[in-house]
UniProtKB/Swiss-Prot annotation:
Cellular component aspect of the GO annotation: cytoplasm
Known role: Functions by promoting the formation of the first peptide bond.
Disulfide bonds: none
Modification sites for Hypusine: 35
Species per Swiss-Prot/TrEMBL record: Methanosarcina mazei (strain ATCC BAA-159 / DSM 3647 / Goe1 / Go1 / JCM 11833 / OCM 88) (Methanosarcina frisia)
BP GO terms, sorted: positive regulation of translational elongation; positive regulation of translational termination
Presence of the UniProt keyword Protein biosynthesis in the record: yes
Lineage: Archaea, Methanobacteriati, Methanobacteriota, Stenosarchaea group, Methanomicrobia
InterPro entries: IF5A-like, IF5A-like_N, NA-bd_OB-fold, Rib_uL2_dom2, Trans_elong_IF5A_hypusine_site, Transl_elong_IF5A_arc, Transl_elong_IF5A_C, Translation_prot_SH3-like_sf
Name of the protein described by the UniProt record: Translation initiation factor 5A
């Protein structure tokens, strides 16, 4: 799910969709309006699911999409290799997710973990 907002309403630390990917905004720089045009904005962001750096340059009056990012909790039902089966604690639905290498030693069966969902993608969100 996503909603539309103007570029001038974006803030650092919030989310934006760039190249059909949900991204976390790292910096925003705005130029002043000139004699013949509107103010421009440069948005630097990092992909929420792939970690790639992306940027958007456009007028501050342009509209961009902002993803609706949800943080939820789930219980780890089973682990098979690098795939964990999780059960959402809110609606009790089950789904599978790939465990990143850096989190393999921290995810255990029976424990509760938090995850992020946006634009139909899911990612574990275990804070250090």
């Amino acid at each position: 799910m996503k909603q539309q907002v103007e570029v001038k309403e974006l803030k650092e630390g919030k989310y934006v969709i760039i190249d059909d990917e949900a991204c976390v905004i790292k910096s925003i720089t705005k130029s002043k309006p000139g004699k013949h045009g509107a103010a421009k904005a440069r948005v630097e962001a990092i992909g929420l699911f792939d970690g790639q750096k992306r940027s958007y340059i456009g007028s501050v009056a342009n509209k961009v999409y902002v993803p609706i990012v949800e943080r939820k909790s789930a219980q780890v039902i089973s682990i098979t290799g690098d795939i964990a089966q999780l059960m959402d604690m809110g609606d009790f639905s089950t789904f599978e997710i790939v465990i990143p290498d850096e989190l393999k030693d921290r995810v255990k069966e029976g424990e509760e973990v938090s995850y992020i969902t946006a634009l139909g993608k899911v990612k574990l969100d275990i804070r250090t």
